[in-house]
Every structure is written in structure tokens, then in C-alpha cells.
Amino acid sequence: GIPLVVTVHSLEPLRPWKREQLGGGYDFTCWLEKTTLEMADAVICVSEGTRRDVESLFQIEPSRLHIIHNGIDPDEYQPAKTHAVLDRFGIDRSKPYVLFVGRITRQKGIIHLVNAIQHFDPGFQVVLCAGAPDTPEIAEEMKTAVAAAQAKREGIIWIGEMIDNPSKIELYSHAAVFVCPSIYEPFGIINLEAMACGRPVVAAAVGGIPEVVVDGETGYLVPVQQMNESPFEPTEPAKFSRDLATRINELMADPAKCEAFGQAGRRRAAEVFSWSAIAQKTKALYDSLTR
């Protein structure tokens, strides 16, 4: 008689690249997810996009689906004044940089960002804080692509290790622009982290990202034509990379707009996505199930 609540952060059927990592275990995780979700009294979806996906993939009454976004602590994620991490990784303080933070996976779309570097205007650095590759194959693909980009452009810094939160916050805080080229992203907490640190975001307009990043206000959303079903790879990957570069170049050439977008992002993160606001919604749902 105890209610079961499940929170969905991603969906296995929409991540077929996990088979590269899990092998036959991928079929088991798909079955386990389906079984758990369909028996739950309530399913928390971290975005409207996730809710639509759950509704289309599983036999769940719409009344059992509830949208409660992920949250953030704006006191932890706020602009940092220190520069130790920049010095540690050889980032030139006198030059602006574009930043990526994330794992090396198909989902995060980092290869499309690396391919966009050839279209970047000169004069700024590119910092790729990217580690934990899903497979040896994608690790090698990343290594080859970055080496090719570095052969043609100076100022590409690849941080291949997973770093702690204070270090990550420092990287966010001093970036001119944060970039999220994900091709599958149910919510995209990294965008929220960057916004809370006062940085503008250029992100792919997929999944739950448009519910976080407000186009033309806290950053830019880049449309991407994708396959209609998983693995959702861009149908025109070269165009997607060029479009990312166009928006990045636009912001990098306009520090005043970067600052305005960054301030708006910080306000939005603190007012809409603080953990106190998210906790109230979560408590209300649990209260409704236990009355």
C-alpha cells in the first residue's frame, strides 16, 4: 500500500548507444525501466519533452505523469572570482574562451562542437572539459578530431579528466560563452549550472533544453534537424556544426550581449530553478499521494 514514485532523468529506449557500453545488459535495463515506470503511482518527468517521450513509449495514464524540473543551488553555483583552475590547465586569462563541459558520449554531441571549431573566428580559446568516454572507440574518435583541430588552430585546451564542482564553477564563471551541442538531453543541468554562474549559453534546441535556455534572452538555441527516432543524429551534421559556430561567433563578437544574457540567465536560474522552488513542487506531489 506504499505509493511508488519514480523520477525520469533519461529513457533507455532513446539511448541505443548504451548498447556499445552495456552489451546485452542494455536489454535488461530497458526491461527494468519499463516495468518500474508502468507500476509507479506517479512518474516525475524532468521536462515537458521527457513527459511526451514517456507517454509515447510506455503504457502510463497521463494523470500519473508530473513535470518537475531539476533544480540547482544558486549559492553554490555563482560567479567565482578565483583563477587557479585556469592557470592549472594553461588557459590564457587575457583571451576569452568558449567552454564545453560533459562526458564524451554520442548523446552529448561533442564531436559536432569539435567539427565546428574550423568555422570559429580567430582570437578566442576553446576549452573542452570532456572525460569519461563511453567506449574506447568514441575515445579514439575524440582524440583524432581534437588533434586535427589543434593542428589548424591555437588555443584549444582539452581537459580530459573529470574535475570537482569548485573547479567546474571557476571554468563556467570565466567563460565568455558556454556551449551545449547535445543531440539528446531530457533536461540539461549543465546549461543551468552555466547560467547560474552568469554565463550565456549556446545550445542545441533538443529535449528539455528549450525549457531552460530562453532563446534571445539567456542565450541562443540552435535548431537541429535530426533522425526521427533514436539515435537522433543530425541529418545534416556539417550544417549543425556551422550553425553552432555562427551563434558562438555572434556572441564572442558582442561582449555586451554576453553580459546581458549572462545576467538574465543568473536571474532565471535563481528564481525558477532553485532547489527551494523545486522542493515545494516535489513535496506537494508526495502529499497528494499520501492523503
Q: For the regions a protein language model found, what residue spans apply to each?
A:
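Carbohydrate-associated surface elements
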Residues: 49, 71
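A conserved mid-protein helix/loop that constitutes part of the nucleotide-sugar donor-binding site
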Residues: 96, 100-119, 140
